[in-house]
């Protein structure tokens, strides 16, 4: 917190309370002394110098510019200020020793942080700005008014230790002067002193008690040498890398190598020194850090300078590679593998692609790589063709097996058909040879074996009638005789009445005879009776089923009783 700013904030209250002005000022000064000092043990000390600053801040300037009449007044004010400063000198020295030790500890911490973080491209204003912003609240009020003189012993030490600074810079340490803080920047000082641009020399940080405000010419020369050191080291590293490149590239001529060196030196001047890429270093591995730094610079320069000769060599070899590709395409066309050169250029097969790359390759390494790729692609394509042939052979074998089965079935079916054909031919031969007759083959009269459809003389069926027995026109057996044939064991006594011949044929019935007149006569009697049709059928059935004469007699008695009942 600034004294002037605090006082001007309290100014309207002081104007409103004019009689209590001195009391309010003393209270404000006491508060400032408590806040700004670390250990305010001497509060009851004389503060007349503070009263003089606040009441008439422009007194010193006006006394320097006044006339001879005002000289005594100016001398009196200066002596008062000097006495007050001498009286308060003891308290200031005690506070200064504490703040200086604390500032040096913080300075060492800042150096270690910078070494861990890596050196920045502009370390001086960064350290000054950060530390000034962090250390403003720790100021003591004595440092604003009374500025200390710069110690000369440290100037001599800094001039003597300029070579040590260069060593530190090579080893990766931050660019800071040993035993003191870095120099301040005018731009940041104006922004951070709360508008007091006229008082830039009066710094108010405890760390800047040892700052060199007026640097000697030796220090300036050392700083300039440090700033010019990095591009020279980069150039040395680049020249070394160029030598290694020129030793490795055997194909490049002397004129091309000189042009490449000029081009590389121009590009190296344009390349800014990269500080953030360098690794952070501690004090234990200084020697290793030098080696790693040198190798990283060489690697970066090689990465930046290598592509140009490779591009030139590839551009020179493209013409030769194209001619070789064309010759290969012509050879393939002449052998009959390809139809045209354009087809070889546009082919997407892996072996063709690797062949093109091998013909266009610039180094033996690329050539061997592409040759291996071509061989592997050819092997893979051959393996694929072998697998395809295996699958085709399997399919052909399956088709052959199925065709064999079909041939077997067809041959069996053909045998069956042949046997049937032979049988039919034999029957036809017999029919045509004999003429359809089963008699003697000596008969020459032949009848056709195939008959056309003609009108057949159908015999009309005539129902059995007992009157036809005398006529002899009975062709079919009557139902009664058929039923009796089914029961051969049971003999009807009526039928066997006058038939003593055991082997009488059915044809004997066609002859008119009187042997069986009893059965027929009884049937005729029953049919001519006035009974109903159902009763007639029942009596005829029962009559034919009789086994003995007594049964026939009983049936006829029942028939007579029925007729008597009807007539009566």
Swiss-Prot record:
Biased composition (Low complexity): 295-304
Region of interest: Disordered: 1-24, 45-324, 434-455, 493-513
Domain of life: Viruses
GO biological process per UniProt: DNA-templated transcription; viral genome replication
Cysteine disulfide partners in this protein: none
GO molecular function, one term: RNA-directed RNA polymerase activity
Gene3D superfamilies referenced in this protein's UniProt entry, alphabetically: 1.10.287.340, DNA helicase RuvA subunit, C-terminal domain, Viral phosphoprotein oligmorisation site domain
Basic and acidic residues: compositionally biased ranges: 7-24, 56-105, 129-144, 151-167, 239-253
Region Interaction with the nucleocapsid (N-RNA), annotated ranges: 479-568
Region (L protein binding): 412-445
Keyword Cell membrane: no
Coiled coil: 387-416
Pfam families to which the protein is assigned, alphabetical: Paramyxo_P (PF01806)
CDD domains assigned: MEV_P-protein-C_like (cd21031)
UniProt entry keywords in alphabetical sequence: Coiled coil, Phosphoprotein, Viral RNA replication
Residue spans of biased composition, Polar residues class: 179-216, 441-450
InterPro entries membership: Paramyxo_PProtein_C (IPR002693), PProtein_oligomer_dom1 (IPR043097), RNA_pol_Pprot-P_XD_paramyxovir (IPR016075)
Keyword Mitochondrion applies: no
Residues covered by region (N0 binding): 33-41
Family named by the database record: Belongs to the respirovirus P protein family.
Domain remarks: The N-terminus consists of a long intrinsically disordered tail. The central part contains the coiled-coil multimerization domain (PMD). Forms a four-stranded coiled coil structure. The C-terminus constitutes the alpha-helical domain that binds to the nucleocapsid (N-RNA complex).
Subunit structure: Homotetramer. Interacts (via multimerization domain) with polymerase L; this interaction forms the polymerase complex. Interacts (via N-terminus) with N0; this interaction allows P to chaperon N0 before encapsidation and form the N-P complex. Interacts (via C-terminus) with N-RNA template; this interaction positions the polymerase on the template.
UniProt function note: Essential cofactor of the RNA polymerase L that plays a central role in the transcription and replication by forming the polymerase complex with RNA polymerase L and recruiting L to the genomic N-RNA template for RNA synthesis. Also plays a central role in the encapsidation of nascent RNA chains by forming the encapsidation complex with the nucleocapsid protein N (N-P complex). Acts as a chaperone for newly synthesized free N protein, so-called N0, allowing encapsidation of nascent RNA chains during replication.
Name under which the protein is recorded: Phosphoprotein
Gene that this polypeptide is encoded by: P/C
């Amino acid at each position: 917190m600034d004294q002037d700013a605090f006082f001007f904030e309290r100014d309207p209250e002081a104007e409103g309370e004019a009689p209590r002005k001195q009391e309010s000022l003393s209270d404000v000064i006491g508060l400032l002394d408590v806040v700004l000092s670390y250990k305010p043990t001497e509060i009851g000390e004389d503060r007349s110098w503070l009263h003089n600053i606040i009441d008439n801040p422009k007194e010193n300037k006006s006394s320097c510019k006044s006339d001879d009449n005002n000289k005594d007044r100016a001398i009196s004010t200066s002596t008062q200020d000097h006495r007050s400063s001498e009286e308060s000198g003891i308290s200031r020295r005690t506070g200064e020793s504490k703040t200086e030790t604390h500032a040096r500890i913080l300075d060492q911490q800042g150096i270690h942080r910078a070494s861990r973080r890596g050196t920045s491209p502009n370390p001086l204003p960064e350290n000054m700005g950060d530390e000034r912003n962090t250390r403003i609240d720790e100021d003591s009020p004595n440092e604003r008014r009374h500025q200390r003189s710069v110690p000369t012993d440290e100037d001599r030490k800094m001039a003597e230790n300029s070579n040590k600074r260069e060593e530190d810079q090579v080893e990766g340490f931050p660019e800071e002067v040993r035993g003191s803080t870095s120099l301040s920047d005018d731009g940041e000082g104006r922004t951070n002193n709360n508008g007091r641009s006229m008082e830039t020399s009066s710094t108010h940080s405890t760390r800047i008690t040892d700052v060199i405000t007026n640097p000697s010419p030796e220090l300036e020369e050392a700083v300039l040498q440090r700033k010019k050191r990095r591009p020279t080291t980069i150039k040395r590293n680049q020249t070394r890398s160029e030598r290694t490149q020129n030793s490795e590239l055997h194909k490049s001529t002397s004129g091309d190598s000189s042009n490449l060196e000029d081009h590389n030196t121009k590009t190296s001047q344009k390349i800014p020194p990269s500080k953030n890429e360098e690794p952070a270093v501690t004090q234990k591995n200084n020697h290793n850090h030098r080696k790693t730094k040198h190798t990283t610079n060489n690697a970066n320069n090689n990465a930046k300078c290598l592509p140009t000769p490779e591009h030139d060599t590839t551009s020179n070899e493209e013409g030769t590679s194209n001619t070789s590709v064309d010759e290969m395409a012509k050879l393939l066309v002449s052998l009959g593998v390809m139809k045209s050169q354009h087809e070889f250029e546009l082919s997407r097969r892996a072996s063709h692609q690797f062949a093109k790359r091998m013909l266009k390759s610039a180094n033996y390494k690329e050539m061997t790589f592409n040759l291996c790729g071509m061989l592997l692609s050819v092997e893979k394509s051959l393996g694929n063709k072998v697998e395809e042939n295996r699958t085709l052979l399997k399919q052909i074998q399956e088709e052959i097996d199925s065709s064999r089965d079909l041939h077997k079935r067809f041959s069996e079916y053909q045998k069956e058909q042949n046997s049937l054909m032979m049988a039919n031919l034999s029957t036809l031969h017999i029919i045509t040879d004999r003429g359809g007759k089963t008699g003697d083959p000596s008969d020459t009269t032949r009848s056709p074996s195939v008959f056309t459809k003609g009108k057949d003389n159908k015999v009309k069926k005539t129902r059995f009638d007992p009157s036809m027995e005398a006529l002899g026109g009975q062709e079919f057996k009557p139902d009664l005789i058929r039923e009796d044939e089914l029961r051969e064991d049971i003999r009807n006594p009526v039928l066997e009445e006058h038939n003593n011949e055991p082997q009488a044929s059915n044809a004997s019935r066609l002859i008119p005879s009187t042997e069986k007149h009893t059965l027929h006569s009884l049937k005729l009697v029953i049919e001519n009776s006035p009974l109903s049709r159902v009763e007639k059928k029942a009596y005829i059935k029962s009559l034919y089923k009789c086994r003995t004469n007594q049964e026939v007699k009983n049936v006829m008695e029942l028939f007579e009783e029925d007729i008597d009942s009807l007539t009566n």
